[in-house]
Amino acid sequence: VHGSRGLGDVYKRQHLVEMDIQVKQSLEGVGQNLQDHLETYVQYECKKPVTLFNEYNPIKMALTGIEWFLFKTGTAAYSNLETGGFIRSNDLVDYPNIQYHFFPSLVLDHGRTNPDRHAFQAHVGPMRPTSRGEIKLKSTNPTSAPSIRFNYMQTEHDLSEMREGIRLAREIFHQKAFDEYRGKEINPGNVDSDTELNEFIKNKGDTAYHPCGTCKMGKDNTSVVNEKLQVYGVENLRVVDASIMP
């Protein structure tokens, strides 16, 4: 995000003209090719009191914080995404195209809202989405926040992989090992058709906070940096962040 914003003076010519910025050098690829990992959460109530819901009592949270501060141990000392995996969603793909994380609680509103019950979930996300977004300037002030448009799930490829990932997560959670823990499905809930799952994905999908690609490395006319991270056509300027990923 900040990589392309930092190159505000070398956006593609049309955008610079629109923003009334004097054009000294323009690169068509600046701010284009925005990519991110989108996730959906397959969530179930847990029939046993063994989840992180036990940790949300304010007193317990304070004690957990003190334990970590003094001893670097306890619940706050490790990632609560305790396990995960990469899976091929069907026999036609030749690489693990879906990633899973298991979390022994509910994520609500990006973690800003505490859960109200014992539950667990799988984070489901396609690895190589084909949808592309863009970042544009909203102001000539270089410190102003840009306009960010991710364009998630704009291709049937991306929607299809997410649907397959959700159905596989359900299959995993319905294995015998989960029988004593698995309660009612919370999300997606009582939906299964492609149309219903598409609506769930579009309404409930969340970012995995992996934006990249807006100053991509390469040699075509949409590339922004070379293999040394040097910006094409500008001396002594490099981009050194995830935006250079093609």
Give the positions of each predicted feature.
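Rossmann-like dinucleotide-binding core of oxidoreductases
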Residues: 18, 34-64, 69-70, 75
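FAD-dependent oxidoreductase catalytic-site/capping-region signature
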Residues: 47-50, 64-246
